[in-house]
């Protein structure tokens, strides 16, 4: 069957394989979202694959109709060019969907927090003896920030590791080194705009562009409230 499809429309067969691979790469992150987002992303990701697969089947079914085969091959070439524009649109729409529908289930933590950069501060896995675990991940689109946040309550916090790695230690309002860098430090965390100065920030990495307003920047830190045993890990870049 596959040999027959390949023989009658080689170009369509090639793009069946290519589009399946691209679709799988686009769809992967949607697996961790709601069922509605999964279904929408599934359609956007695999639509070109479905179209070229149907074309391949038609080429096989109509192999003896030379006129039909000629038309199908012309349509295949046209769609080959059009799919480039389609993927630009689909990637943008999927990126917006992923950004507006963040991952908040802690059981998916290890799928997203696995790079060396993140694990400089974030734990490689969520400790079992902690309470009130909350996780947040959302990729940025255009000027929006990409954010990773982990929050929990831990009665056995060890500060030594953070002190060794920190380039700066203090509360949010005490930070004056880079204008605007930590203005949204606690966004997407459970304590946003609430008792922010009760947390001591251990800033591991922080930098901004030369705009003086931090239009583009990045920070990585752990923030700890020793009175309540709350700890927040966060990476944000925009």
Model-derived segments and spans:
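Transmembrane helix-loop junctions in multipass membrane proteins, especially transporters and channels
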Residues: 28-35, 61-65, 95-103
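N-terminal membrane topogenic signal
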Residues: 3-15
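N-terminal export/targeting and maturation segments
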Residues: 86-163, 168
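Membrane-embedded alpha-helical segments of integral membrane proteins
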Residues: 17-60
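Non-catalytic accessory regions used for complex assembly or targeting
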Residues: 12-15, 27-35, 46, 75-76, ...
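Extracytoplasmic electrostatic interaction patches
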Residues: 166-238
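Cytosolic-side transmembrane helix boundary signature
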Residues: 48-84
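Juxtamembrane loop-transmembrane helix junctions in multi-pass integral membrane proteins
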Residues: 7, 36, 67-71
């Amino acid at each position: 069957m596959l040999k027959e499809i390949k023989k009658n429309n080689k170009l369509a067969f090639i793009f069946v394989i290519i589009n399946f691979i691209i679709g799988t790469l686009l769809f992967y992150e949607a697996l961790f979202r709601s069922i509605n987002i999964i279904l929408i992303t599934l359609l956007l990701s695999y639509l070109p694959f479905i179209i070229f697969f149907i074309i391949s089947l038609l080429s096989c079914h109509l192999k003896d109709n030379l006129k039909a085969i000629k038309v199908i091959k012309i349509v295949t070439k046209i769609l080959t060019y059009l799919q480039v524009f389609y993927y630009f649109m689909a990637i943008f729409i999927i990126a917006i969907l992923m950004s507006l529908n963040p991952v908040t289930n802690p059981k998916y933590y290890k799928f997203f927090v696995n790079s060396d950069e993140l694990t400089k501060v974030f734990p490689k896995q969520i400790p079992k003896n902690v309470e009130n675990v909350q996780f947040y991940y959302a990729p940025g689109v255009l000027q929006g920030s990409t954010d990773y946040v982990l929050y929990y309550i831990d009665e056995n916090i060890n500060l030594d590791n953070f002190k060794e790695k920190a380039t700066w230690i203090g509360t949010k309002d005490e930070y004056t080194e880079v204008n605007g860098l930590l203005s949204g430090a606690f966004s997407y965390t459970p304590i946003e705009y609430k008792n922010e100065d009760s947390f001591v920030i251990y800033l591991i990495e922080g930098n901004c562009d030369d705009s003086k307003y931090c239009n583009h920047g990045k920070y990585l830190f752990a923030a700890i409230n020793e009175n309540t045993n709350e700890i927040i890990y966060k990476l944000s870049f925009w």
